[in-house]
Amino acid sequence: MFQLESLKNKIIVIKYGGSIFHTLKNNKSFIEDLKTLKKCGANIIIIHGGGNEISKWLKKLQINNKFINGLRVTDSTTIEIVEMVLSGKINKQLVSTLSKEGINSIGLSGVDNNLLLCKKKYTFVNEIKKDLGYVGEIYKVNTDLLINIMNLGIIPIISPIGTDINGNRYNINADYAASSISSALNANRLIILTDVDGIYKNINDSSSLIENINLTSIKKYIKNGIVNNGMIPKLQCCSHSIEHGTKSVQLINGNRSHCIYNALFNKCGTKIVKGDDLKCQKAI
C-alpha cells in the first residue's frame, strides 16, 4: 500500500504539457499537490511544453508551421521564436505562479550550464532521411546541476531548449526531454500531464481506458494500430524512459482535480511498467 511518507528523497519528474498550460492559474489543486509532495520530502522536477503557444506566435509573425512525424521543423528564424516562447514566456510564468504560492522554484533552459547537451536530430519518412533543422536529440543531461538545486529544496522548471558543444540551440520535444531527464536521474516516477485521461483501447469508448500496461503491450498496441497519431511518440518516450532507468511512468489528464496526488495512488491515468501489466509494480 502506497504511503505519502515513502516519498521522502524520491525523485518525481513531471512533464507539464503545453496543451494544459492555459489552465495553470486556475488549477489550485495542482499547486496543492506540489505542496503536498514537497512537505513529504519529495524531489520534484518540472519540464514544460508549449507547442500551442509556439504555433500561435508563429502565426502572428506570419511564419509557416511545418511538421514531419509530429516534430516541428525548426529553421534559424523559428528557433528564435521557440526559445522566446518556451524560455522567456512560459517558463517564467510557471516560476512566477509557483513563487506566488510560496513554492521555491527556479527557471532553467537546457542551455543553462549545458543542462541538456544535444546533437542534431533527423527523422525518416518511407526510409528517406529528413532534415528537421534545429531540432535536437539529447545525449547528456547535467544531473549534478539538477541534484544540487533539488538539495536546496528548490524545484527546477525546465524549458526544453538544448545546446550542442558549439553553442547552437535546439528545439527538443518536451516529452523526449522529460524522458531523458527522468531516466538520467533514475527517477522513481515520471508523470506526464496531458489533456486526455490516458491510453484507450478505443478512443471513442471511455470505458476502455487502460490502467496498467507494460512495454511489450505498448509495442503490440502501436503495431496493431490500437494507439496512433500523437499518442505514439508519447508512448515511445514512456518506453524509452522505463528502459533507461525510470521506475514507472504515468500518463494522466492534467486538467483533472488533484491529478498528481491521485496518480501517486494509481487512481487515474495509465501506468507504464516493465513487468506484468496486470500486477502493477511498486515504484516508490
Curated annotation (Swiss-Prot):
Signal peptide: none annotated. Keywords: Amino-acid biosynthesis, Arginine biosynthesis, ATP-binding, Cytoplasm, Kinase, Nucleotide-binding, Transferase. It is found in: Cytoplasm. GO terms for biological process: arginine biosynthetic process via ornithine; L-arginine biosynthetic process. It is an enzyme of class 2 (transferase). SUPFAM superfamilies: Carbamate kinase-like. HAMAP family: ArgB. Catalyzes the ATP-dependent phosphorylation of N-acetyl-L-glutamate. Belongs to the acetylglutamate kinase family. ArgB subfamily. This is Acetylglutamate kinase. It comes from Clostridium novyi (strain NT).
